[in-house]
Design a protein with these regions (language model features):
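Hydrophobic, regular-secondary-structure patches
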Residues: 1-35, 184-194
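Short helix C-cap/helix-to-loop transition motifs enriched in small/turn-promoting residues
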Residues: 7, 40-44
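Acidic-residue sensor for enzyme active/binding pockets
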Residues: 13, 49-52, 74, 205
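Hydrophobic secondary-structure segments that place a key small or acidic residue at a functional site
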Residues: 18-22, 32-38, 49, 56-131, ...
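Active-site/binding-pocket entry motifs
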Residues: 39-41, 201-202
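Short, flexible, mixed-charge acidic loops at enzyme active sites
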Residues: 49-54, 156-160
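Mechanotransmission and gating elements of multispan inner-membrane complexes involved in transport
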Residues: 100-103, 111-214
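Selective detector of the "anchor" transmembrane alpha-helix that sits immediately C-terminal
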Residues: 216-218
Length: 218
């Protein structure tokens, strides 16, 4: 995953986190939308640099009662406010998740309020989600936050088909922080990946940049 920080626009990559969905059930047999991720992760890069990244930065607007699980808190979990309320869960309680005979107990470190589907689910550490799936090392997708330049005609042309660009057009496009060029470069360094924009939030600090959320599907 650290390859994401090796692209030409590496300094425009703000944060990223893997996501892995698990179809699990709780102690009552009820289906619980479960997601494995990095909450706050220290990553050593091949360049010798290190970064701190994770869902705590990508979802900084979430309301958290309690705290985010620490990187080394193997059994820590975030529980959505809707699920917690309907099951009488508070910080410090235990949530038991099972998938196809594999069972794990998790401690509720925080209760999240997002205003979306996350409120109905449970978030756990990525290795624990992999253990429930019995698939070590697997990742479903990676969400990437990047600073990008607003699209123009060249960017839109490239987004449709990069191969339609002339040599000079492709050089200009590749060396400009368009969302399509950053997505293209992520696909170059991540084998068998597809990167696409999923959300854009305008930045208003006198700089013509946008903060774009990219979802890279592996």
């Amino acid at each position: 995953l650290g390859n994401i920080k090796t692209i030409f626009w590496t300094y425009n990559i703000l944060d990223f986190a893997p996501l892995l969905s698990v179809s699990a059930t709780d102690a009552s047999g009820e289906h619980v939308p479960t997601t494995g991720t990095w909450f706050g992760h220290h990553l050593e890069l091949a360049t010798g640099e290190s970064i701190e990244t994770g869902l705590d930065k990508l979802r900084g607007w979430w309301g958290i009662e309690g705290s985010w699980p620490a990187d080394d808190d193997e059994d820590g979990a975030l529980v959505g406010a809707t699920y917690a309320a309907s099951h009488g869960l508070t910080v410090g309680d235990t949530v038991t998740l099972t998938r196809e005979g594999i069972t794990r107990d998790f401690t509720v470190r925080g209760i999240l309020t997002s205003g979306d589907d996350a409120d109905r689910g449970v978030f756990i550490q990525l290795p624990q989600a992999q253990a429930l799936l019995n698939r070590e090392g697997v990742v479903g997708s990676v969400e990437v936050s990047a600073l990008t330049t607003p699209d123009n005609d060249l960017a839109r042309k490239a987004a449709k088909n990069p191969n339609s660009l002339s040599v000079s057009e492709k050089e200009t496009w590749y060396c400009t922080a368009y969302v399509s060029s950053i997505a293209f470069q992520i696909e170059e360094v991540m084998t068998d990946s597809v990167a696409r924009p999923v959300r854009q939030v305008a930045q208003s600090e006198g700089v013509i940049l946008e903060k774009t959320q990219l979802l890279m599907v592996l």
